Curated annotation (Swiss-Prot):
It catalyses: 2 a quinol + O2 = 2 a quinone + 2 H2O. It comes from Sulfolobus acidocaldarius (strain ATCC 33909 / DSM 639 / JCM 8929 / NBRC 15157 / NCIMB 11770). The chain crosses the membrane at residues 19-39, 64-84, 98-118, 150-170, 185-205, 226-246, 271-291, 303-323, 333-353, 369-389, 412-432, 460-480. The gene is soxB. Belongs to the heme-copper respiratory oxidase family. Keywords: Cell membrane, Copper, Electron transport, Heme, Iron, Membrane, Metal-binding, Oxidoreductase, Respiratory chain, Transmembrane, Transmembrane helix, Transport. It holds the Pfam family COX1. Heme a3 binds at residue 372. Its EC number is 1.10.3.-. PROSITE patterns: COX1 (PS50855), COX1_CUB (PS00077). It is found in: Cell membrane. This is Quinol oxidase subunit 1. One of its GO terms (biological process) is electron transport coupled proton transport. GO terms for molecular function: cytochrome-c oxidase activity; heme binding; metal ion binding; oxidoreductase activity, acting on diphenols and related substances as donors, oxygen as acceptor.
């Protein structure tokens, strides 16, 4: 198969693994967009004497960063991880053409929406998100009601197409599942949270469609109802990637620990706890809104229930590692899974105080919150997704395994990425605890050192991720260049770690037996 044919097979996929690669490449593109936007907005934050004139550029970079992350990267990455979980469970994506159509159309439409340079924050609260006057423009380039309505309309359609992609994944998973067999733990989490995504993502489509009707049909927007509708999507979306990655950790960590999962029953029951919990705690994003006491108490209880599910995941995986004889951290996939788990513990611990009504005022709308969820992104999501990506590389080429040298450099890259970004996250959290508010371009000079440290550490850490990804890809492509075609393995890369000399002896002995016969 020529290089052009291979590219065509990803651009317009005809098999499960090609669909996975298509969505993976899409997610990496949006990761680049959100990363560039982040470094641009951080450039402004390193200066403590910003003119009000730079506010528009700062908030536009902030909004594009958020939209590219939450509305583009997250659904793409979730679909890639879930699709790969099906592949690893010997299930198939049947409707490859439809998945390609959903991918290309949704990305083009999201690009059109972002081309207007949105300037209102990723959660686009009313009334700012629907204003365009001498005081404020929700979009820097789309300043007329028609253009603003068009932007929200194409976003609605894009989100509907994304929802259709997850519905397709669910349908294809059950259509190809052998009767009487249950899904392995990776696919079980993938399918379960495809359902969560398919249920909650339409809330974003409805919210943006409401804005469209405001511009084209003069339908009034109720601020509180709109916010409630948005957060029914807005809270679960932060788990669209982490929860399928939980399935990946349940799948990989036992392999590299050399034993079965400590309790698969816990892992499977935990799906219900996490799935239901994530759709019931959205109100904790509305702590400063005039909510009744009963609802506030529900926020506390439901969030603790959700935290229990996360804690059970940590306990299950931790016991799997600690009761094993030896964990194979020298394999980059094993190393990535371990870093993801440790990062999730450290990032998750910070979140326990946030939903508590009596404590939240100390942290609400501060950089403490930013530090918490970015730690989760930089460790569990980025490192967890990198772990899956590396296994995708090995799975895509029959017989391929990373060399000892490339494995070493990928481990170095993972630590190189993780250590500085842990520092960034904790610097953000300390600044937030001291009173640094999020989304503010003008700030007291006392916080400038924190912003300088955060930007400096981020610049140090980024090459680590690039090193990990490029070394892995170079090693895989160097191997593939010696192969006539891309092919799917019949045996997992983990089980192929066999001494070559012993393998040759076995083959020779079998030939001898055949000759005697």
């Amino acid at each position: 198969m020529s290089l052009i044919e291979r590219i065509k097979n990803v651009v317009w996929p005809k098999d499960t693994l090609s669909v996975v690669w298509l969505y993976t490449i899409g997610s990496i593109f949006w990761l680049g967009v959100l990363g560039i936007a982040a470094m641009n907005l951080r450039t402004f934050l390193t200066y403590d004497q910003n003119s009000p004139n730079v506010g528009e550029l700062y908030y536009s970079a902030l909004t594009i960063h958020g939209w590219a992350a939450m509305i583009a990267f997250v659904p793409m990455a979730a679909a890639a991880v879930i699709g790969f979980s099906l592949y690893k469970s010997k299930l198939s994506i049947i409707h490859t053409k439809q998945m390609a159509i959903f991918f290309w159309l949704s990305n083009v439409l999201l690009g059109i929406a972002m081309a207007g340079s949105p300037d209102m924050g990723w959660y686009m609260y009313p009334p700012l998100a629907i204003e365009s006057n001498s005081q404020f423009h929700a979009f820097l380039f789309y300043t007329t009601p028609q253009l603003m309505g068009m932007a929200y309309l194409v976003m609605s359609i894009a989100v509907i197409l994304q929802t259709a992609a997850f519905v397709t994944l669910i349908a294809d998973a059950y259509a190809t599942k052998p009767k009487g067999e249950r899904l392995n733990i990776f696919a079980a989490y993938g399918v379960a949270f495809s359902i969560v995504i398919a249920v909650t993502l339409p809330a974003l489509a409805a919210a943006t469609l409401w804005y469209t009707l405001y511009f084209f049909a003069n339908v009034p927007v109720n601020n509180l109802l709109w916010a409630i509708l948005f957060w029914f999507y807005g809270h679960p979306v932060v788990y669209y990637v982490p929860f399928p990655l939980f399935g990946a950790l349940y799948y990989y960590i036992p392999q590299y620990a050399g034993r079965s999962l400590y309790s698969e029953k816990w892992a499977r029951w935990n799906i219900y706890l996490l799935a239901i919990g994530t759709m019931g705690v959205w109100v904790h994003h509305l702590q400063t809104w005039p909510l009744p006491i009963v609802l506030r108490e529900w926020v506390n209880l439901s969030t603790l229930i959700l935290a229990t599910g996360s804690g059970l995941t940590v306990l299950n995986l931790g016991l799997t590692i600690f009761t094993s004889r030896k964990y194979d951290w020298k394999d980059p996939v094993g190393m990535g899974a371990l870093i993801s788990l440790i990062g999730f513990i450290l990032a998750g611990a910070q979140a326990l105080v946030l939903p508590e009504n009596s404590i939240n005022p100390l942290f609400h709308n501060s950089y403490y919150v930013v530090g918490h969820f970015h730690l989760m992104i930089w460790t569990l999501i980025i490192m967890g997704y990198t772990t899956v990506f590396l296994d995708m590389l090995r799975t895509s080429f029959a017989g391929f395994n990373f060399s000892a040298t490339s494995s070493k450099w990928m481990r170095i890259g993972m630590i190189w990425w993780t250590a500085p970004f842990m520092g960034v996250g904790y610097a953000m959290s300390v600044a937030g605890y001291l009173g640094f508010l999020r989304r503010m371009i003008a700030y007291p000079v006392i916080f400038q050192p924190y912003n300088l440290v955060e930007s400096f550490l981020a610049e140090i850490g980024i090459p680590g991720l690039l090193l990990t990804l490029f070394v892995g890809m170079f090693d895989a492509l160097a191997y593939a260049s010696k192969q006539p075609v891309f092919s799917s393995p019949s045996v997992s890369s983990f089980s192929m770690q066999v001494d070559k000399g012993e393998l040759v002896k076995k083959i020779d002995s079998e030939k001898g037996v055949n000759n005697v016969g």
